[in-house]
Each structure stands twice: as C-alpha cells, then as structure tokens.
Design a protein with these regions (language model features):
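Iron-sulfur (Fe-S) cluster-binding modules
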Residues: 1-14, 28, 102-123
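Functionally engaged cysteine thiol sites
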Residues: 3-5, 24, 86-91
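Local sequence-structure signature of Cys/Sec-based thiol-disulfide redox active-site neighborhoods
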Residues: 7-39
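Non-catalytic, surface beta->alpha helical segment in thiol-disulfide oxidoreductase systems
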Residues: 75-114
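Thiol-based oxidoreductase modules, predominantly thioredoxin-like and allied folds used
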Residues: 44-56
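Acidic pyrophosphate-coordinating catalytic loop
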Residues: 57-63
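Structural micro-motif
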Residues: 64-71, 87
C-alpha cells in the first residue's frame, strides 16, 4: 500500500526541479506555471524542488542553461543543443514568441512525456 502523503507525480516517476538564481525574476513565473500545469494534470500535491544556483562553478557543475531551468526527472526538456551554461536569464520559444518561462501547456506536455517514458521504462 502506498502512503497517502506520496505525491502523485512521484508515483508516476516524475520529479520536478526548478533551478534558478536570485537575479532573474522569471523563475517565479515558471514556478507558478509548473504548479498550474501539475494542477491541470491532477498532480497538484506534487513537491517541486527549488535549487539555487549562485556561483559560476555551480552553474557549470549543474549544466545550468540559465534561469529558470526546469528539470523533469533530471532532464531539461527545453534545452537547446549548444546553449551556453552560466548565470543568465533564459528565454524559451513559446507559441506566442520568446518568453521567460514555458507556457502551462508546454509544461504539461513535458510532464506527461516524462511520465510516459517512466511508465514504459524509456529514457
């Protein structure tokens, strides 16, 4: 039997981390949108980990592509190949143009895709 306090996303194998640095306001928008996406997916009780990246060394060690970086099961579903690592604000391509955070729909898709990969054993 699964304990009642276990988040639904954890049961589905989905873990979410928002990496950020204090100088970028977009991580708070991303945090709100992640919560909305989880709520729309019926996963509103899911814990979201926040990880402060506050030095260039930590940015390199974490493979931090800018704030906010949203990791779903440890993977950045929005990373562009060759995007620089470092302490900077990040831009995302959305259906409405460039923005400081993915849309709720984009986040829902990323979370659902990660859950599907987890349940089928895919990477």
């Amino acid at each position: 039997m699964v304990p009642a306090a276990t988040p639904v996303a954890t049961l589905l194998g989905v873990q979410i981390t928002i990496q950020y640095f204090e100088g970028c306001p977009n991580w708070e928008v991303a945090d709100e949108r992640v919560r909305l996406a989880l709520a729309h997916l019926g996963m509103g009780a899911t814990d979201v980990t926040r990880e402060l990246i506050d030095t260039p060394e930590k940015a390199v060690a974490a493979g931090f592509h800018g704030s906010p970086t949203i990791l779903v099961n440890g993977r950045d579903p929005f990373a562009d190949r060759g995007s620089p690592v470092g302490l900077s604000c990040r831009l995302f391509t959305t259906p409405h143009g460039l923005a400081g955070s993915p849309t709720v729909d984009q986040l829902m898709h990323a979370i659902e895709s990660a859950g599907s990969r987890s349940s089928t054993g895919g990477a």
